[in-house]
Amino acid sequence: MVLSLCVMAPNRIVWNSEVREIILSTNSGQIGILPNHAPLLAALDMGVLKIRSDKQWSAMALMGGFAMIDNNRVIILVNEAERASEIDPEEARKSFQTAQAELAEAEGRRKLIEANLTFKRAKARLEASTIV
């Protein structure tokens, strides 16, 4: 049994093929999806989507969105997505360190929220780049 996975961003279809298993980062934590999963609609957090095709794992950084699972079909609508192969690990590491420093120094509610979003984005990109 397989899952039909389609990941769509506003400007492109990022992934559209059959997979064996996926692991999603939702607002309430990570969930694994296997064939014959119960129907589900989930809000996605900024994080990593892990995809298993046969014995190979792939990853992509997702920048929030929604996932709909029904009848072995998974449709993921995201604000932005980057495949791990599109991310430079060294650049992702530098961005993460910069975001971490900015978060530690952020003062005021607005600056803290902005720094936290930048940090979560950088963390997702770094995690995705190291899974390959």
Curated annotation (Swiss-Prot):
Keywords: ATP synthesis, CF(1), Chloroplast, Hydrogen ion transport, Ion transport, Membrane, Plastid, Thylakoid, Transport. It comes from Adiantum capillus-veneris. Belongs to the ATPase epsilon chain family. It is a peripheral membrane protein. SUPFAM superfamilies: Epsilon subunit of F1F0-ATP synthase N-terminal domain. It holds the Pfam family ATP-synt_DE_N. InterPro entries: ATP_synth_F1_dsu/esu, ATP_synth_F1_dsu/esu_N, ATP_synth_F1_esu_C, ATPsynth_dsu/esu_N. GO terms for cellular component: chloroplast thylakoid membrane; proton-transporting ATP synthase complex. F-type ATPases have 2 components, CF(1) - the catalytic core - and CF(0) - the membrane proton channel. CF(1) has five subunits: alpha(3), beta(3), gamma(1), delta(1), epsilon(1). CF(0) has three main subunits: a, b and c. It is found in: Plastid, Chloroplast thylakoid membrane. GO terms for molecular function: ATP binding; proton-transporting ATP synthase activity, rotational mechanism. Gene3D superfamilies: 6.10.140.480, F0F1 ATP synthase delta/epsilon subunit, N-terminal (2.60.15.10). Its main location: plastid. This is ATP synthase epsilon chain, chloroplastic. Produces ATP from ADP in the presence of a proton gradient across the membrane.
